[in-house]
Amino acid sequence: MKAERIEQILLIHLLATAILAVLAFGTVESWSLVIFEINALVMAVMMGLLQLVDDDFQWRRLRFSLPLWALLLWGLIQLAPFGIAAPAGGPVDAPPESLSLAQLRLPTISKDPQSTREVVARLLALAIYFTVALQVFRCSAARRLAVRVLAVFGLAISFLAIAQRLTWNGRLYWVRQVSAFVSPFGPYGNYNHFAGMVELLFPLPFAWLIFSRGRGGERILYAIAVVIMVTAAVLSMSRAGMLTIGVQLAFFAGAAFLHRRRQGGGPRLTPLLIVVGAVLLSLWIGYQPLLRRFGTIQQ
């Protein structure tokens, strides 16, 4: 019972982190990164507690996270000191023994140890989150909950992004002033980042629409979520985002066709209706800007 409770807390914690990381302007600033990394350490402690109370806990279930941990290990190796210490300050010709520790620099594989340390810290946090996800999403009920939560969140944040674009006053969330040198969209300071978020979110409800036979109300909600998310990504004017989403939609259309042909299931017109809906809504909201943007894709 304790193990189930801890897993439920981890699941809610993980989904809340995914949502808040987006809302915090994409978690690219120092304050949000610190919270993101400390939060990962808290989840690591909870995973340790889960291992202690769960008799069925098996680390081999988490083996898919090994590439991330291997990459983290490579980052640590790049920070490992080797060779003879060199002066980092003071007279260049001074003998090392006459310098303090603050004036010595130990050679490392990394040419920029400070940047490497920052990346290693972020990679550690991401590895922890991914490992937790592998543990909590073993259950099909948890996966269904994640699809519902992320689909509704994707719908809400995309609707907010469209509304913010139509009523843009030079401020994120209509409150925070942004520099004239950035190109924000939604909660992000870079429209390409918003498009990247949509590329990750909209396949979840879209795949559910194609491969699952759910209730009518849920299907309508997911279809609306996909249309709004794709529309928001198109209106972000991210050329790479448009091309990537186009490839994703083509892939899902092919998957839907094969699914229908092999198993005789799945709604035949779902991908086509979603594409048509997203295109029409995008043209209705931003016809002229889209034409200008498509004219620059060849560049």
Each model region followed by its residue ranges:
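Membrane-helix interface linkers and caps
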Residues: 51-65
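Membrane-interface helix-loop-helix modules in multi-pass membrane proteins
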Residues: 63-65, 71, 75, 87-88, ...
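Extracytoplasmic catalytic/substrate-binding loops of multi-pass membrane glycan-assembly enzymes
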Residues: 299
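Alpha-helical transmembrane segments of multi-pass inner-membrane proteins
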Residues: 1-27, 34-48, 68-72, 76-82, ...
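Extracytosolic (periplasmic/ER-lumenal) interhelical loops and adjacent juxtamembrane/interface segments
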Residues: 84-111
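Acidic-enriched, low-complexity/disordered segments with a strong bias for Aspartate over Glutamate
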Residues: 54-56, 93, 112, 169
